A protein has these predicted regions:
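Positively charged n-region of N-terminal signal peptides that target proteins for export
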Residues: 1-4
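Sec-dependent N-terminal signal peptides
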Residues: 6-13
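C-terminal segment of classical bacterial N-terminal signal peptides
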Residues: 14-23
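Cleaved targeting-peptide boundary
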Residues: 25-32
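Extracellular/lumenal mature domains of secreted and surface-exposed proteins
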Residues: 28, 37-44, 48-50, 61-63, ...
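Short, well-ordered beta-strand segments enriched in hydrophobic/aromatic residues
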Residues: 55-61
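Ligand-binding face of N-terminal immunoglobulin V-set domains in extracellular IgSF glycoproteins
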Residues: 98-104
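Ser/Thr/Pro-rich, low-complexity mucin-like regions
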Residues: 105-148
Length: 270
């Protein structure tokens, strides 16, 4: 029980810390919501040790627009240091997006060393700095608490079992992408709501959807979200069309409502 409450407390601390980091940069609730014309603020979500001794540092972002999707190419205006390009997104969906990517650092990474993600758009520069502060250590139970998915310690993230590989297309041709995932059937549907889960969403089962992760602007995806309950493989199919040549990364996300797994597909458009 002591460990359980420690995890919950840590999750709350990480959540509050993220809010503190963002508070000076995101709109207050009293401000008028803006559909367009706003900037993006990166966010450090916390760090997690890996089985091989390395450490993953997780980042997300807050697109302050309610409707507008933004594109910021890799470079001085979308930069992670050290390294420059560490797998960060270039396409930004509206509002708060958590745990979007991680940066793996070696096991001897110093406590005072930082991973810094800088985003600049519309003349505004925002920065997220991640380092190994003990209070910012997270695990899957903390992630479930942050996403409102309860605290099922036995839950495991979905697993992709098949899907499209890298593709090449010539304009104006489209590409069709598929991804199939399966899950352990947790969290299970609740017949009687647990006291600690009151206010959280009901488990929705496994779903798979496609998003634009990287590439030039002008990508259109046909609807690609499928949900089919518990412990069944789910296949999502989407058709992507492009306006510009370039290298794109399209991401399939499998979620059980609490934990997620992603699969990236690179599409080269000529």
């Amino acid at each position: 029980m002591r460990k359980r409450w420690l995890l919950v407390s840590t999750g709350i601390l990480v959540y509050l810390t993220s809010n503190v980091l963002l508070r000076a940069q995101v709109p207050y609730a009293s401000e008028v919501p803006m559909d367009r014309g706003q900037d993006v603020t990166p966010a450090f979500e916390g760090w997690m040790p890996n089985a091989d001794g390395t450490i993953s540092m997780y980042f997300g972002y807050m697109n302050r627009n309610y409707k507008e999707e933004l594109d910021i190419p890799i470079g001085p205006e979308n930069n992670v240091e050290p390294g420059g390009d560490r797998g960060q997104p270039t396409h930004f969906y509206p509002r708060r997006q958590r745990m979007v990517f991680s940066v793996v650092v070696p096991k001897d990474w110093g406590l005072d060393k930082k991973v810094v993600w800088t985003l600049t758009i519309r003349g505004k520069t925002n920065v997220a700095k991640g380092w190994l502060q003990p209070e910012w250590q997270i695990d899957k139970e903390v992630i479930m608490q942050q996403t409102g998915g309860g605290s099922d310690s036995q839950n495991q993230p979905p697993v992709f079992v098949s899907g499209s590989e890298s593709q090449t297309a010539n304009l104006p041709n489209t590409v069709t992408l598929t991804a199939t995932a399966q899950d352990d059937g947790r969290p299970k549907p609740r017949r009687v709501r647990d006291i600690e889960d009151v206010g959280g969403p009901e488990p929705s089962g496994l779903s798979v959807r496609w998003i634009i992760y990287r590439g030039p602007a002008g990508v259109t995806l046909s609807p690609g979200t499928v949900s089919s309950g518990y412990q069944k493989p789910v296949t999502s199919v989407t058709t992507a069309s492009f306006k510009l040549p370039g290298i794109y990364v399209l991401r399939a996300i499998a979620s059980d409502g609490s934990l997620s797994t992603y699969r990236d597909v690179t599409v080269t458009v000529k």
